[in-house]
Design a protein with these regions (language model features):
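Extreme N-terminal starter segment of soluble prokaryotic enzymes
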Residues: 4-10
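Conserved N-proximal alpha/beta basic substrate-recognition cap immediately N-terminal to
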Residues: 15-132
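Rossmann-like NAD(P)H-binding beta-loop-alpha module
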Residues: 122-150
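Protein kinase-like catalytic core scaffold
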Residues: 153, 211-212, 257, 273-275
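Phosphate-binding site of ATP-dependent enzymes
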Residues: 159-248, 252
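A long amphipathic alpha-helix within ATP-dependent nucleotide-binding catalytic cores
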Residues: 222-272, 297-315
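Glycine-rich phosphate/pyrophosphate-binding beta-alpha loops
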Residues: 278-291
Length: 316
């Protein structure tokens, strides 16, 4: 338990994501921390380095009682974790949890292996590994994937955000084109969920609570992402949907996340299929359509954890 009076935390971000929507989120978190009487300093991954075999940057961390890792630089996160574990300093979210969400194949693997849990996942096949300099010299493997998934099929890079690395292959010709284009890049072949084409729900989870939810819809694209032209509206999530989102966050060991669900059985029934999970989900849009500031919820949660009033989420 830490006395939170005049406490300092460190918000670690990416040095190369400096456009307005990223910086705005950092400022929202800092302002939310201020409301909790917590000083939250900003540091990016060009200011703090994972260093081995010589004097490191550990001295820069001495003043902090917790870290919010709002980046996907997993190598840096693991270096930070080594330092923090020795001193009992919590990292929100943990490097393992961030990595579990960053790699979409890893997300599905962990959810499949979650003890005593059953999650409905998009039927997916992980593309076989090749290298950019080699390419796919033989694509016979695609025949068995076609039989398992059918067309149209979604081809999704394992590492990506805002729907930008997600493609729809209507036939074998398009599947081959994307397959060859992505040689050397980890990706998935996924079943196209027609009942949820262009529509999904985002549930924002903090701790064990769904704090806000919105429905996203696109009339022109199979992806519902707002960055691709989708529209948003506040959504009243059912208890079933909330339970699913919270179970997902717990299974992945996340403190907070955006959980995206698909309407696998149609919009007249609860969204029941996990699409993906974002450990660093942007929250401006969901704030605009629901009035809920997720930054406030995150900092309230962190303060409760630091004060020993709430247990953290742990995988398993």
């Amino acid at each position: 338990m830490i006395a939170t009076k005049n406490i300092r935390g460190l918000l670690v971000t990416n040095a190369f994501l400096k456009n307005g929507k990223f910086v705005e989120h950092y400022e929202w978190l800092r302002e939310a921390a201020k409301q909790q009487e917590i000083r939250l300093d900003l540091c990016d991954n060009a200011m703090l380095h994972a260093i081995y075999g010589m004097e490191s940057d550990e001295a820069k961390l001495a003043a902090y009682s917790f870290i919010i890792f709002w980046d996907k630089d997993i190598r840096l996160a693991k270096w930070l974790e080594r330092y923090c574990q020795k001193r009992g300093i919590p990292i929100f979210n943990t490097p393992e949890a961030v990595a579990a969400c960053d790699d979409k194949s890893e997300t599905f693997r962990l959810l499949t292996e979650a003890p005593e849990e059953a999650f409905s996942l998009i039927p997916s096949v992980v593309a076989p590994l090749t290298f950019a300099a080699v390419g796919y010299t033989d694509v016979d493997f695609l025949s068995s994937i076609e039989k398992q998934i059918g067309y149209p099929m979604v081809i999704k890079e394992c590492f990506g955000s805002f729907g930008w690395q997600v493609y729809l292959a209507k036939d074998r010709k398009e599947a081959l084109r994307y397959t060859k284009k992505l040689a050397g890049t980890p990706f998935l072949y996924q079943k196209f969920i027609a009942a949820s084409a262009g529509v999904d729900v985002r549930l924002q989870v903090v701790g064990t609570e769904v704090v806000a939810a919105m429905k996203r819809r696109s009339k022109t694209d199979f992806r519902a992402n707002l960055s691709n032209g989708g529209q948003m509206e506040a959504y009243e999530a059912s208890q079933e949907e909330c339970d699913l989102a919270v179970r997902t966050v717990l299974a992945l060991g996340l403190d907070f996340a955006g959980v995206d669900l698909l309407f696998a059985s149609g919009e007249d029934k609860p969204a029941n299929m996990i699409c993906e999970v974002n450990s660093n989900a942007h929250f401006r849009n969901i704030a605009e359509c629901t009035g809920v500031n997720t930054a406030d919820k995150i900092m309230q949660y962190i303060k409760r954890v630091l004060e020993g009033k709430q247990e953290r989420n742990h995988r398993g």
